[in-house]
Amino acid sequence: MTTTLERRESASFWEQFCAWITSTENRLYIGWFGCLMFPTLLSAISAYIIAFIAAPPVDIDGIREPVAGSLLYGNNIISGAVVPSSNAIGVHFYPIWEAASIDEWLYNGGTYQLVVLHFFIGVCAYIGREWELSYRLGMRPWICVAFSAPVAAAAAVFVIYPIGQGSFSDGMPLGISGTFNFMLVFQAEHNILMHPFHMLGVAGVFGGSLFSAMHGSLVTSSLIRETTENESANYGYKFGQEEETYNIVAAHGYFGRLIFQYASFNNSRALHFFLGAWPVVGIWFTAMGVATMAFNLNGFNFNQSVVDSQGRVINTWADILNRSNLGMEVMHERNAHNFPLDLAAGESLPVALVAPAVAA
């Protein structure tokens, strides 16, 4: 008997590397987009943690009045933040090598640009990695489309808005109270509450929460029991089973009687498309709204729109909102300018021509 031994060709190191990168058998899928995502996100996270703990104060307004944001400089978890880059830098690209020293780079808030730009590249690569894994597994590509909504929102507040306003100092601070400060100042300067795209975003977020709660409770309440009363219902199901887990007809009938017939879905694909599309489209609109307001195309102004027959103004909620906007703008950057832009831009009027007479 003759035995023939065929020499086995060994794959090159590059081929082995490619197979490992694109393998769906790995516990954590890497992918070619992951080669960009992992280093950028790790850089952003590392810089953020270090800056949140120990970064020195940043001259955010460019007027030599630094603002402290780190824990070691007196902040706590609520008040702490990575403070945005200085207004003196504007929208210039400000890597470490552009500064004369590390101290100057930290004083001008270079850490903020480092974190934000690496984070933005990382989450964009995460979208690509979602598409790549879906492609490898033969799935449809809608997961990455859904994730594009929060990425669009992040791009709007961290990249597009600072560019539109002319300075990264107008970007959203990376902290809890800094986020709230950004929201208040945004309302004061752009009247975002009166912008229709923001209204659609609110409907998307709150509506999505409502629909998610309704769907989850209906599914949990209409599970098809596969076990006896003496066993847990969870033992009757296994991951990837072909049989239905819950009775959509029963859920449809319940909800149709609870509200009205056409308020419920009897098609699972249409139902889940709606659950995915509603919040995603809403957040897309919010991101577009912030992007347009970045270039000062602001919310509607209905101030002093209602007057009586004598021409006297009848205040509406729009006027109340306008007064609160002016108040917030007065408090914002109080040392950088004396008046809000809305007040400082008007023609000055004399308030007194002569000194009042004082009775003896």
Curated annotation (Swiss-Prot):
Keywords: Calcium, Chlorophyll, Chloroplast, Chromophore, Electron transport, Herbicide resistance, Iron, Magnesium, Manganese, Membrane, Metal-binding, Oxidoreductase, Photosynthesis, Photosystem II, Plastid, Thylakoid, Transmembrane, Transmembrane helix, Transport
GO molecular function term, any single one: oxidoreductase activity, acting on diphenols and related substances as donors, oxygen as acceptor
Binding site for pheophytin a: Y126
Site annotation Cleavage: residues: A344, A345
Swiss-Prot/TrEMBL site (Tyrosine radical intermediate) positions: Y161
Residues flagged as site, Stabilizes free radical intermediate: H190
Binding site for chlorophyll a PD1: H198
Cellular compartments per GO CC: chloroplast thylakoid membrane; photosystem II
Keyword Lipid metabolism found: no
SUPFAM superfamilies xrefs: Bacterial photosystem II reaction centre, L and M subunits
Enzyme class: oxidoreductase
Segments crossing the lipid bilayer: 29-46, 118-133, 142-156, 197-218, 274-288
Residue sites binding Fe cation per the record: H215, H272
Topology in the lipid bilayer: Multi-pass membrane protein
Highest taxon above the source species: Eukaryota
Binding site for a quinone: H215, S264, F265
Pfam families listed in its UniProt record: Photo_RC
Family: Belongs to the reaction center PufL/M/PsbA/D family.
Leftover remarks: 2 of the reaction center chlorophylls (ChlD1 and ChlD2) are entirely coordinated by water.
Subunit-structure text: PSII is composed of 1 copy each of membrane proteins PsbA, PsbB, PsbC, PsbD, PsbE, PsbF, PsbH, PsbI, PsbJ, PsbK, PsbL, PsbM, PsbT, PsbX, PsbY, PsbZ, Psb30/Ycf12, at least 3 peripheral proteins of the oxygen-evolving complex and a large number of cofactors. It forms dimeric complexes.
Family annotation (NCBIfam families): psbA (TIGR01151)
Functional note: Photosystem II (PSII) is a light-driven water:plastoquinone oxidoreductase that uses light energy to abstract electrons from H(2)O, generating O(2) and a proton gradient subsequently used for ATP formation. It consists of a core antenna complex that captures photons, and an electron transfer chain that converts photonic excitation into a charge separation. The D1/D2 (PsbA/PsbD) reaction center heterodimer binds P680, the primary electron donor of PSII as well as several subsequent electron acceptors.
Protein name: Photosystem II protein D1
